[in-house]
């Protein structure tokens, strides 16, 4: 405002005639009056004094525009006049001189408007990648016995919470600076601007609220889109990449605001929500500065909510458990019947039957690359696409009923897939106990396995052997009647192997069933009741034998009797 007034005064002084007031024409007298008000405003020592002179200046300028004696930007003048009058009527006299004078309430719109439109939504994109990565198939969170649609809701909520926390962390430094130096601001602080030839008046509180709603709507849409598409496609990055394209789309000329306004199809896309300033309006460091229409808040939210509903509908369909007949025999046990096992378009195993009865331990023996892990993943029910045909059930519960099946069957994966690097061993065990509603005595279990001394360490700091014992403790702590253990003895010294074998033997004695994949044939022969070999893409059951006999059978089967 002051810059415009100073410019007028300078121009007036340059062209002002050296004559008395009686020699001035009406237009010159009007200019002199304007210059007087402008000088008074510029010389004002308080905002209240400035406001009195500024209102008179803009009112007189408005008369000049109406009479035609003044030409120029009438809309800016009228907006400034409306702003001054609103301040006067509300009794507010605070006028920010620059962005550094903005209170907290005005800082957020200013910060969002001066940044690229996609920037506020990057936290939600990052959080979607992190959360979906932490809950991808095969992770501990994905194994929990939770209905698929409820898990989807939990993932969406986690993305929203994490994204909001990241966004607040990014805005915190500037927001705290504005709050400490300039205060919170006044909710009723007036804002006036022109758009499409119409004067619009609102308040800082309204703009702040509308912007928060726009950011939340955009973040929610990103969260739902990312979670649903990644769940439906079983690809962690499918959802976040699609969301990233939507967020970036408003930056493309084809999808600009003008294009959206003239294209019915583009207008149906939820793109305005990713340009929140366009929908909510914006005041810069001075309240008559304006970017965006400020008239699309309601429609923007309606479209965003409609898309959220559509995505949730897709998610409900994608997570629905299809009807599938169970196996012919419905007695207690883990049963695989007439199954083809594979991944992608490749079938690697054809299995007539596999039955693991309660209170038994079975071993799975085969060379690396023969399909052991793929078979174990299929048996776990966590990877439904591994079973290309046939049926899998535990105690008559079909694996398609994922939550009920997960209460019965637990897969302890090889490597560190079950462990989160930043969480401690005790946090993993607490999660397992809570998720599976287990009554396991964690303290006693940890003592028996010898892992109590390092329970509080993040798992990334544990050795391979320590991780193996933590994973075994997690499997036991689920209280699932059927445990599938992929290479549970790898990386253990002889003493720890004995401890782990004793723990597994104890669980079998309690009536639990254990299927163990291992290359340590001596331990396997001592621990299990029967064995399965993978031969030429089929599963072959072997009778109980000594370790020496088992080794010879292994050599005969896979090494040609050498």
Feature map (PLM): residue ranges:
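Helix-to-loop junction immediately C-terminal to a conserved catalytic motif
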Residues: 380
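Terminal transmembrane helical anchor/hairpin motif
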Residues: 92-102, 183-205, 246-326, 557-560
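Secretory targeting signals
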Residues: 93-128, 157-227, 231
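Conserved ABC ATPase "signature" region
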Residues: 430, 439-455
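Conserved ABC transporter NBD signature motif
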Residues: 385-405, 541
């Amino acid at each position: 405002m002051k810059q415009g007034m100073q410019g007028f005064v300078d121009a007036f002084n340059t062209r002002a005639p050296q004559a008395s007031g009686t020699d001035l024409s009406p237009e010159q007298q009007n200019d002199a009056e304007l210059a007087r008000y402008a000088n008074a405003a510029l010389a004002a020592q308080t905002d209240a004094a400035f406001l009195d002179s500024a209102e008179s200046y803009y009112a007189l300028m408005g008369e000049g525009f109406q009479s035609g004696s003044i030409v120029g930007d009438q809309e800016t003048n009228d907006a400034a006049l409306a702003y001054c009058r609103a301040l006067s009527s509300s009794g507010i006299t605070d006028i920010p001189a620059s962005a550094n004078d903005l209170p907290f309430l005005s800082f957020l719109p200013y910060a969002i408007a001066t940044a690229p439109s996609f920037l506020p939504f990057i936290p939600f994109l990052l959080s979607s990648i992190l959360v979906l990565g932490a809950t991808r198939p095969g992770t501990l969170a994905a194994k929990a016995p939770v209905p698929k649609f409820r898990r989807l809701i939990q993932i969406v909520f986690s993305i929203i919470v994490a994204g909001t926390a990241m966004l607040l962390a990014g805005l915190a430094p500037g927001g705290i600076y504005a709050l400490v130096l300039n205060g919170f601001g006044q909710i009723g602080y007036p804002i006036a601007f022109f758009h499409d030839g119409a004067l619009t008046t609102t308040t800082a509180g309204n703009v702040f609220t509308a912007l928060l709603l726009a950011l939340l709507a955009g973040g929610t849409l990103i969260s739902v889109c990312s979670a649903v598409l990644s769940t439906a496609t079983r690809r962690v990055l499918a959802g976040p990449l699609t969301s990233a394209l939507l967020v970036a789309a408003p930056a493309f000329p084809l999808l600009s605001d003008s294009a959206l306004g003239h294209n019915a199809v583009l207008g149906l896309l939820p793109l305005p929500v990713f340009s929140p300033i366009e929908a909510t309006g914006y005041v810069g460091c001075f309240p008559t500065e304006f970017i965006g229409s400020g008239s699309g808040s309601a429609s923007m939210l309606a479209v965003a909510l409609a898309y959220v509903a559509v995505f949730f509908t897709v998610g409900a369909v994608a997570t629905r458990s299809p009807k599938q007949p169970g196996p012919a025999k419905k007695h207690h046990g883990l049963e695989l019947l007439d199954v083809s096992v594979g991944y992608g378009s490749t079938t690697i195993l054809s299995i007539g039957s596999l039955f693991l009865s309660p209170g038994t331990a079975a071993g799975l023996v085969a060379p690396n690359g023969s399909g052991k892990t793929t078979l174990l993943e299929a048996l776990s029910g966590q990877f439904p696409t591994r079973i290309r045909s046939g049926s899998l059930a535990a105690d008559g519960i079909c694996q398609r009923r994922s939550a009920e099946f997960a209460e019965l069957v637990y897969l302890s994966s090889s490597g560190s897939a079950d462990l989160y690097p930043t969480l401690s061993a005790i946090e993993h065990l607490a999660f397992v106990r809570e998720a599976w509603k287990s009554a396991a005595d964690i303290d006693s279990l940890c003592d028996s396995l010898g892992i109590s001394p390092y329970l509080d360490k993040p798992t990334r700091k544990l050795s391979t052997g320590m991780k193996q014992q933590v994973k075994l403790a997690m499997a036991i702590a689920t209280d699932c009647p059927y445990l599938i253990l992929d290479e549970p003895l790898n990386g253990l010294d002889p003493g720890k192997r004995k401890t782990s074998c004793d723990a597994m033997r104890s669980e079998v004695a309690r009536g639990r069933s254990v299927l163990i994949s291992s290359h340590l044939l001596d331990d396997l022969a001592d621990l299990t009741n029967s064995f399965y070999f993978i031969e030429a893409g089929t599963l072959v059951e072997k009778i109980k034998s000594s370790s020496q006999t088992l080794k010879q059978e292994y050599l005969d089967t896979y090494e040609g009797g050498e």
